[in-house]
């Protein structure tokens, strides 16, 4: 009897250990490291019909103005594979956030809404239109912003309400980034990142343009123009970059719900969104004339210099303006937002001409 009890106890311990252990990535995603498929709508026609039912006005504007050959599934919505301390695990709870282009790679950031797993960067090779790796970061940051300056990949730091320290950003050297792409799942260690680079405003989203890292701050109040961006010059030698935070430029007058921005020539494009279920118009990409909004101090006040405002599907996040295309990332495809008015499970590629002909 005692022997049976001992064996039973050992069995319970073993089962508990197995349950607690990391679950390896699903076999079907062994090559990509995370899912890379459309979660809700398997083809553009299905997505179009859903958009027409939920947001008819947006459908009318977008119909015939999206590029199906440039649109990609948002990685990791079905399953994200994570590697922490050498152990692989999976999650279905990741929420997409940031978006940027680094050479021919498209980078999409995401965080685990339950804060159980570390944040990730999905890496998509736009030449082959395939997911090549999922990089697990050494933190659980919201990962709201990412930008590439040609040498380093910049990322937003801690932004949670619990964090009481100074705001900061970090970067990952591009050469280090490339070294992680040989594996479908890879783990970025803390020493591979730069030190914390402290700045003057909360880093909600990022944009790089002509030697300046623009850091946007989400204000979150409806129907106001309280969001803004600070532009910090990137200085220092390669491998030891820092930001000049003593002197910085300001872009003010953005929608308070700003989620992302991109500068293209003389124009600023701002992605703003609030409210996931309302049928009111709450999600936009707005084009501003930067040149005409410059003040006597060299800063910019874009309020009053709006040239085009286009309603887009709900819960838009960071954007890229690239040649003739606007790429839009969304968080509404995440399981956490399954009750959203419209679940967009793709990085939409939209014709830039929707915002007027000139960049």
What are the roles of these predicted feature ranges?
Residues 87-91, 134-139, 194-199, 249-254, ...:
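Surface loop/turn motifs at the tips and blade-to-blade linkers of beta-strand repeat domains
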Residues 89-102, 144-149, 153-154, 160, ...:
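Structural signature of eukaryotic scaffold interfaces centered on beta-propeller domains
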Residues 108-109, 155, 215, 270, ...:
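Residue position within the beta-strands of beta-propeller blades
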Residues 7-14, 22-87, 346-359:
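Sequence/structural signature of beta-propeller modules
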Residues 115-122, 161-177, 221-233, 277-290, ...:
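Structural motif
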Residues 250-300, 317:
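Loop/turn-rich, solvent-exposed surfaces of beta-rich toroidal or solenoidal domains
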Residues 74-117:
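Beta-strand-rich domains and repeat architectures in extracellular enzymes and scaffolds
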Residues 175-210:
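Asp-box/WD-like beta-propeller blade repeats and closely related beta-sheet repeat scaffolds
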